UniProtKB/Swiss-Prot annotation:
Family: Belongs to the RuvB family.
HAMAP family linked to this entry: DNA_HJ_migration_RuvB
Matching Pfam families: AAA_lid_4 (PF17864), RuvB_C (PF05491), RuvB_N (PF05496)
InterPro entries documented for this protein: AAA+_ATPase, AAA_lid_4, DNA_helicase_Holl-junc_RuvB, P-loop_NTPase, RuvB-like_N, RuvB_C, WH-like_DNA-bd_sf, WH_DNA-bd_sf
Reactions this protein catalyses: ATP + H2O = ADP + phosphate + H(+)
Domains: entry comment: Has 3 domains, the large (RuvB-L) and small ATPase (RuvB-S) domains and the C-terminal head (RuvB-H) domain. The head domain binds DNA, while the ATPase domains jointly bind ATP, ADP or are empty depending on the state of the subunit in the translocation cycle. During a single DNA translocation step the structure of each domain remains the same, but their relative positions change.
Name of the protein: Holliday junction branch migration complex subunit RuvB
Origin species: Neisseria meningitidis serogroup B (strain ATCC BAA-335 / MC58)
Compartments it resides in: Cytoplasm
UniProtKB keywords: ATP-binding, Cytoplasm, DNA damage, DNA recombination, DNA repair, DNA-binding, Hydrolase, Nucleotide-binding
GO terms, biological process: DNA recombination; DNA repair
């Protein structure tokens, strides 16, 4: 039986959260994951560049240059890493920045790589400084420099490594140190998806899950998925549950709308937490500007939750502005709630 991961937040995971909520969800994601660049939907610019770089590396018989994938969570960075390894015809070893606590943890991974293999480090911005220092010569010269022993008896040992490709993924490229960032020869930013591509992704997932779904049903799910495939696939599974009970398993536009409305996800992809925040700015503070601490106190959320979880999507979609004087609701926010626009 699969166990749900412990979440750091005290509140339940939002259905529109871009992070993976549980081990079971991660397992389902893997089942829906495309296996080749041709199957990968969206991110056309990144795909085109990677296809050329991969073909060139294979033609020369070399390891692919180190790759940095960055962008918001849930856009397919892990999927792309697996696809790159498959397209290269090599093995992939996967880990994450917080797991690599000591230099020996990284050394154990690197010394077990075969020539041209891919090492994928998720959340690479969370590498400890000591591990990052060990990584530099490995990336530049395919060599490990490690210290054995302590005090006067300590000595440096150099270990040659096979040529390999590091793929780093991060949601916070700005937190990478300059020396680490400069060692990536290929840098790709993943963007939020257009509704058109999300509709295709939802339709593909429905086929893999053997669901009876109309084009309108796929479009309804896509437009509420906040530009994020992970959210789209999660909403699809919840709509499937609703359709199984209410409509003999058939998902059309009306069923998708009813299911998502029941889940409090509106037509713009906003959930209860988003609306609670915007309504506080609009009704309690006259649309702003208002300081972050005041809004946090008004809605009973921490400032960290507001900055990291609530605000990014609202700003990206044009519902909110951050100004030197505080947060301000935009014209789009007024219109969304049917309020007269403040002049």
């Amino acid at each position: 039986m699969l166990q749900t991961d412990n979440l750091t937040a005290a509140q339940p995971q939002r259905i529109v959260a871009a992070q993976t909520a549980s081990a079971q969800e991660e397992l389902l994601e893997r089942a829906l994951r495309p296996k080749t660049l041709d199957d990968y939907i969206g991110q056309d610019k990144a795909k085109e560049q990677l296809a050329i770089f991969i073909q060139a590396a294979k033609k020369r018989g070399e390891a692919l240059d180190h790759v940095l994938l960055f962008g918001p969570p849930g856009l397919g960075k892990t999927t792309l890493a697996h696809i790159i390894a498959k397209e290269l015809g090599v093995n992939l070893r996967q880990t994450s920045g917080p797991v690599l606590e000591r230099a020996g943890d990284l050394a154990a991974l690197l010394t077990n790589l075969d020539p041209h293999d891919v090492l994928f480090i998720d959340e690479i911005h969370r590498l400890s400084p000591v591990v990052e220092e060990i990584l530099y010569p490995a990336l530049e010269d395919y060599r490990l420099d490690i210290m054995i022993g302590e005090g006067p008896a300590a000595r440096s040992v150099k270990i040659d490594l096979p040529p390999f490709t590091l793929i780093g993924a991060t949601t916070r490229a700005g937190m990478l140190t300059n020396p680490l960032r400069d060692r990536f020869g290929i840098v790709s930013r993943l963007e939020f998806y257009e509704n058109r591509d999300l509709t295709t992704i939802v339709s593909r997932s429905a086929q893999l899950l053997q669901l009876d779904m109309s084009e309108e049903g796929a479009e309804e799910i896509a437009k509420r998925s906040r530009g994020t495939p992970r959210i789209a696939n999660r909403l699809l599974r919840r709509v499937r549950d609703f359709a199984d009970v209410k409509n003999n398993g058939t998902i059309d536009g009306g069923i998708a709308d009813a299911a998502l409305s029941m889940l409090d996800v509106d037509a713009q992809g906003l959930d209860v937490m988003d609306r609670k925040f915007l309504e506080a700015v609009l009704h309690k503070f006259g649309g702003g500007p208002v300081g972050l601490d005041n809004v946090a106190a008004a809605i009973g959320e921490s400032t960290d939750t507001i900055e990291d979880v609530i605000e990014p999507y609202l700003i990206q979609q044009g519902f909110l502005q951050r100004t030197p004087r505080g947060r301000m609701a935009t014209e789009r926010a007024y219109l969304h709630f049917g309020l007269p626009v403040e002049k």
